[in-house]
Amino acid sequence: MSRRGTAEKKTAKYDPIYRNRLVNMLVNRILKHGKKSLAYQIIYRAVKKIQQKTETNPLSVLRQAIRGVTPDITVKARRVGGSTHQVPVEIGSTQGKALAVRWLLAASRKRPGRDMAFKLSSELVDAAKGSGDAIRKKEETHRMAEANRAFAHFR
């Protein structure tokens, strides 16, 4: 065990235009090969497309989408007596948001089409409405946790 103290949590930074932490989380997750300016371009174009589609505040749509996709509980594999059980575990808000962002980006990458900004904006609008692949992933995770509720005492 480490003799040092626990490391303090890093506070998430804000993005330069919207001053929003969620936008920055999206930018950092969509980032590939260190091309952060390209990641910002994609996100900002997606936000503009959301504005055009819904004619409402795009950041509220983003917040609603992430709130809809954020899981309360997940399953972790745990070995007990030679067999592996899926043990349901509650997760914190920060970890839940990180999972939600990851699932939203994975779902938008799976969508047909070439333009990532368009795919991301479509997925975010769908998630805000309560449909889409990312919402399905959250429901599937919750179903798995419910099905394995008997193993909750292995925590």
From Swiss-Prot:
Gene Ontology molecular functions: rRNA binding; structural constituent of ribosome
Cellular-component GO terms for this entry: plastid; small ribosomal subunit
Gene Ontology biological-process entries: translation
Compartments (UniProt record): Plastid
UniProt keyword Ribonucleoprotein, yes or no: yes
InterPro entries for the chain: Ribosomal_uS7, Ribosomal_uS7_bac/org-type, Ribosomal_uS7_CS, Ribosomal_uS7_dom, Ribosomal_uS7_dom_sf
SS bond partners: none
Keyword set, alphabetical order: Plastid, Ribonucleoprotein, Ribosomal protein, RNA-binding, rRNA-binding
One Pfam family cited in the UniProt record for this chain: Ribosomal_S7
Primary location class: plastid
Subunit structure: Part of the 30S ribosomal subunit.
Stated family: Belongs to the universal ribosomal protein uS7 family.
Primary role: One of the primary rRNA binding proteins, it binds directly to 16S rRNA where it nucleates assembly of the head domain of the 30S subunit.
Name of the protein: Small ribosomal subunit protein uS7cz/uS7cy
Origin species: Cuscuta exaltata (Tall dodder)
